[in-house]
From Swiss-Prot:
Its EC number is 3.1.-.-. Single strand-specific metallo-endoribonuclease involved in late-stage 70S ribosome quality control and in maturation of the 3' terminus of the 16S rRNA. Its main location: cytoplasm. This is Endoribonuclease YbeY. PROSITE patterns: UPF0054 (PS01306). Zn(2+) binds at H111, H115, H121. Keywords: Cytoplasm, Endonuclease, Hydrolase, Metal-binding, Nuclease, Ribosome biogenesis, rRNA processing, Zinc. It comes from Azotobacter vinelandii (strain DJ / ATCC BAA-1303). It is found in: Cytoplasm. Its cofactor is Zn(2+). The keyword Coiled coil does not apply. The lineage of its organism: Bacteria, Pseudomonadati, Pseudomonadota, Gammaproteobacteria, Pseudomonadales. Belongs to the endoribonuclease YbeY family. GO terms for molecular function: metalloendopeptidase activity; RNA endonuclease activity; zinc ion binding.
Length: 162
């Protein structure tokens, strides 16, 4: 079971909470244990501040992942961590990349959840594994390959907004 805390700190239109839950559950289904996860949906000011504080990059990015570092057995439900998603960046990227907004949202939520599970894309081999899993999961939802186009930025690497 997934315990999802969806925190909305944006006035912009958003996918339904059921969509966020479906995307998270799909990404986390390899976990047999119950999980707790927070997704905070923010505007550019908060997104920029968090990215500056935690990654030392002075611009808002699409998704930030904060894996929990809680000793095992301390909580009834294992806390996976937090995702912070910058709503205007997601909207802008989807438009610039000619992607359906729901497909891009699904991709970024899945991408962030995989980071919370320990996946990364720093090394090429890790990136290939993570991207392959993202493609497979998104295909199950009926969405196209999010990496179909080498000129597109990876999640978490969005440069300063245009």
């Amino acid at each position: 079971m997934l315990e999802l805390d969806l925190q909305v700190a944006s006035v912009r239109p958003l996918p339904a909470e059921d969509d966020f839950r479906r995307w998270c559950e799909l990404a986390l289904r390899q976990r047999s244990a119950d999980s707790e996860l927070t997704i905070r949906l923010v505007d550019e000011e908060e997104g920029r501040e968090l990215n500056r504080t935690w990654r030392h990059k002075d611009y808002p990015t699409n998704v930030l992942s904060f894996p929990a570092e809680v000793p095992e057995g301390l909580l009834d439900i294992p806390l996976l961590g937090d995702l912070v998603i910058c709503v205007p960046v997601v909207e802008r990227e989807a438009a610039e990349q000619d992607k359906a907004a729901d497909a891009h949202w699904a991709h970024l939520v899945i991408h962030g959840c995989l980071h919370l599970l320990g996946y990364d894309h720093i090394e090429d081999a890790e990136a290939e594994e993570m991207e392959s899993l993202e493609r497979d999961l998104l295909a199950e939802l009926g969405y196209p390959d999010p990496y179909d186009g080498d000129d597109l930025p990876e999640p978490g690497t969005m440069s300063e907004g245009r």
